[in-house]
């Protein structure tokens, strides 16, 4: 059985091809989803990839969350479908209310593009089951608005419920509160992170193949469901 993973393309999306390739490398079938699609074509999971959807006008992800396809993604996520938001996709998921908090301008007010070490904090999500808790992975980070912020109550809730999925190791590149690089929904089916695992799937072209574990994980989750 091959799981079908939808990869959304908005105007301004940059990383849909890389996300689709990561799905294929993990053994899944990547299905293209257009922002105007009124259905999800029977996919088992969805990836909202990185880029600059709608030119980042208003706020990053603020317009994309109103795209027809996102209405279907929200419904599917509420029904338990695994959804991953990467970089701009993380911003979209926050705007859509699937994840708490917001991503704001980096603390240094500059675009960051470099490889970053992340610590895997939670392995019970649909997207991280292949990792060991406490493992450190190397993946690229490229964003200008990647600073995760939320109220202290929300941050305490995320920490207390084990929903901080990834944390930056060493220095905090963008000033994210508590060094948070990625979080999950309460049921662990929806995950958002700012760094790019899809760019770390082949050692030849990336800093590592550490990101591939996320795509293996969701295929495991879908097949075992």
Curated annotation (Swiss-Prot):
UniProt pathway annotation: Purine metabolism; IMP biosynthesis via de novo pathway; 5-amino-1-(5-phospho-D-ribosyl)imidazole from N(2)-formyl-N(1)-(5-phospho-D-ribosyl)glycinamide: step 1/2
Gene Ontology MF terms: ATP binding; glutaminase activity; phosphoribosylformylglycinamidine synthase activity
Active site per database record: 87 (nucleophile), 196, 198
Source domain of life: Bacteria
One GO cellular component, as annotated: cytoplasm
Reactions catalysed according to its record: N(2)-formyl-N(1)-(5-phospho-beta-D-ribosyl)glycinamide + L-glutamine + ATP + H2O = 2-formamido-N(1)-(5-O-phospho-beta-D-ribosyl)acetamidine + L-glutamate + ADP + phosphate + H(+); L-glutamine + H2O = L-glutamate + NH4(+)
Record has Cytoplasm as a keyword: yes
A biological-process GO annotation: 'de novo' IMP biosynthetic process
Residues annotated as domain Glutamine amidotransferase type-1: 4-225
Keyword Electron transport: no
Localisation per UniProt entry: Cytoplasm
Predominant localisation class: cytoplasm
Key words of the record: ATP-binding, Cytoplasm, Glutamine amidotransferase, Hydrolase, Ligase, Nucleotide-binding, Purine biosynthesis
PROSITE patterns: GATASE_TYPE_1 (PS51273)
EC numbers on record: 6.3.5.3, 3.5.1.2
Annotated InterPro entries: Class_I_gatase-like, PRibForGlyAmidine_synth_PurQ
Subunit and interaction comment: Part of the FGAM synthase complex composed of 1 PurL, 1 PurQ and 2 PurS subunits.
Function: Part of the phosphoribosylformylglycinamidine synthase complex involved in the purines biosynthetic pathway. Catalyzes the ATP-dependent conversion of formylglycinamide ribonucleotide (FGAR) and glutamine to yield formylglycinamidine ribonucleotide (FGAM) and glutamate. The FGAM synthase complex is composed of three subunits. PurQ produces an ammonia molecule by converting glutamine to glutamate. PurL transfers the ammonia molecule to FGAR to form FGAM in an ATP-dependent manner.
Official protein name in the record: Phosphoribosylformylglycinamidine synthase subunit PurQ
């Amino acid at each position: 059985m091959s799981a079908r993973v939808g990869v959304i393309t908005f105007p301004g999306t940059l990383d849909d091809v890389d996300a689709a390739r990561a799905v294929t490398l993990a053994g899944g079938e990547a299905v293209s989803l257009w922002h105007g699609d009124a259905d999800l074509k029977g996919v088992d999971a969805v990836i909202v990839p990185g880029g600059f959807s709608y030119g980042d006008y208003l706020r990053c992800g603020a317009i994309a969350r109103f795209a027809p396809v996102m209405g279907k993604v929200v419904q599917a996520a509420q029904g338990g479908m695994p959804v991953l938001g990467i970089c701009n996709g993380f911003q979209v998921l926050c705007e859509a209310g699937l994840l708490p908090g917001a991503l704001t301008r980096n603390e240094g007010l500059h675009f960051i593009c470099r490889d970053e070490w992340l610590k895997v904090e939670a392995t019970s999500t649909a997207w991280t089951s292949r990792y060991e808790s406490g493992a450190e992975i190397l993946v690229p980070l490229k964003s200008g608005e990647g600073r995760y912020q939320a109220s202290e109550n929300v941050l305490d809730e995320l920490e207390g419920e084990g929903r901080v999925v990834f944390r930056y190791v060493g220095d905090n590149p963008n000033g994210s509160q508590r060094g948070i690089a990625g979080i999950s929904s309460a049921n662990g089916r929806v995950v958002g992170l700012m760094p790019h695992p899809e760019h770390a799937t082949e050692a030849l072209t990336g800093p590592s193949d550490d990101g591939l574990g996320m795509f293996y994980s969701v295929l495991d989750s879908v097949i075992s469901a």
